């Protein structure tokens, strides 16, 4: 395998560059990187790429038995289609579940008082369980009869 890596460098020659980091460029803090990761996770799981390409409406509508138009947030019976609000709601749940796991992880720090540890555990479990069960409710709204045992 080493010979395969060496073959291109038999022909190519690496330049002798002395590159320096610009003085205005600083390493971002851990919380800045974390915030960027969470925001990008929220946008990607919300289907921002799908929303840009397909341009779906923000909410849909259906006609009830009296002939009135009623707004609906979920595009039922379509697994590969979504309204914008549906994607944002699902993305919020996924992000809340992920933050719940991070809160549960942070509760294991050795220097946290007992009351704060209990509160972090409670909030973490609530976030994870709420996001899980609400995602199941969303799946029942999206595909009626799918998770019915």
From Swiss-Prot:
Localization, UniProt: Endoplasmic reticulum; Membrane
Spans within the Extracellular topological domain: 54-83, 139-149
Residue intervals passing through the bilayer: 33-53, 84-104, 118-138
Segments on the Cytoplasmic side according to the record's topology features: 1-32, 105-117
GO terms of molecular function: protein-macromolecule adaptor activity
General function of this protein: Subunit of STT3A-containing oligosaccharyl transferase (OST-A) complex that catalyzes the initial transfer of a defined glycan (Glc(3)Man(9)GlcNAc(2) in eukaryotes) from the lipid carrier dolichol-pyrophosphate to an asparagine residue within an Asn-X-Ser/Thr consensus motif in nascent polypeptide chains, the first step in protein N-glycosylation. N-glycosylation occurs cotranslationally and the complex associates with the Sec61 complex at the channel-forming translocon complex that mediates protein translocation across the endoplasmic reticulum (ER).
Assembly with partners or alone: Component of STT3A-containing oligosaccharyl transferase (OST-A) complex. STT3A-containing complex assembly occurs through the formation of 3 subcomplexes. Subcomplex 1 contains RPN1 and TMEM258, subcomplex 2 contains the STT3A-specific subunits STT3A, DC2/OSTC, and KCP2 as well as the core subunit OST4, and subcomplex 3 contains RPN2, DAD1, and OST48. The OST-A complex can form stable complexes with the Sec61 complex or with both the Sec61 and TRAP complexes. Interacts with PSEN1 and NCSTN; indicative for an association with the gamma-secretase complex.
UniProt family annotation: Belongs to the OSTC family.
Protein name: Oligosaccharyltransferase complex subunit OSTC
Organism: Homo sapiens
Gene assigned in the entry: OSTC
């Amino acid at each position: 395998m080493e010979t395969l890596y060496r073959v291109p460098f038999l022909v190519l020659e690496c330049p002798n560059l002395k590159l320096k980091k610009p003085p205005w460029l600083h390493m971002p803090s851990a919380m800045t990187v974390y915030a960027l990761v969470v925001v990008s996770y929220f946008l990607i799981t919300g289907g921002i790429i799908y929303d840009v390409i397909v341009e779906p409406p923000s909410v849909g509508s259906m006609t009830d038995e009296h002939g009135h138009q009623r707004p609906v947030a979920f595009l039922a019976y379509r697994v590969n289609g979504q309204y914008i609000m549906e994607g944002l709601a699902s993305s919020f749940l996924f992000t809340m579940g992920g933050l719940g796991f991070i809160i549960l992880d942070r509760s294991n720090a050795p220097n946290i008082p007992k009351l704060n540890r209990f509160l972090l555990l409670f909030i973490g479990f609530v976030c994870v369980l709420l996001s899980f069960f609400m995602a199941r409710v969303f799946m029942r709204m999206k595909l009626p009869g799918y998770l019915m045992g």
